[in-house]
Amino acid sequence: MAITQNLINQVKEKILQKISHTYLFQHIQKPVIDDERLLLILSILQEAKLSDKDIEKYTITTMLIQIALDTHELITNESCDKDLEKNRQLTVLAGDFYSGHYFQLLAEAEDIHMIKILAEAIKEINEQKIFLYQKTAANLKELVESIVIVEHALLDKLIAAFHMEKWKDLSSSILLIKRL
């Protein structure tokens, strides 16, 4: 399977089908699918010589997790009126809705190993987000390292799982630059 714009569009369409919910989209902003991250995941998995079915499955599940994490980042803690409070609650539910699809896809495929791999990435991301929110970085290097983990942990786990270490530096650099 060559990575073409057509393939990228097909995968994006399948992701949108998974996350599409009329009521949610009426009240919260529609999630953004990160094209660069999508292309990196597709490239890594394709080079790992996985089947087309597995490439699609792992790309979609990884992107669903990223969308869920990104959606949760939109939640604010500031006080607000009832309409904004409803929006905040729906944003939390949307993030949970998107991540639920990740579990469902891998569970249906009985891919417990990948559930564990991606769950470990989610754990690392959330630990680093807590670290960043606490503002306990001792220096700039620590701060950047935490940001890299937040941005790259999902890909890092895929890279390790499929022994594609040559992608690690490039993909982490691309995602860090995008974040900064």
Can you describe what each PLM-predicted range is?
Residues M1-K12:
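N-terminal amphipathic/basic leader segments beginning at the initiator methionine
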Residues E13-L180:
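Mg2+-dependent prenyl diphosphate-binding active-site environment of isoprenoid biosynthetic enzymes
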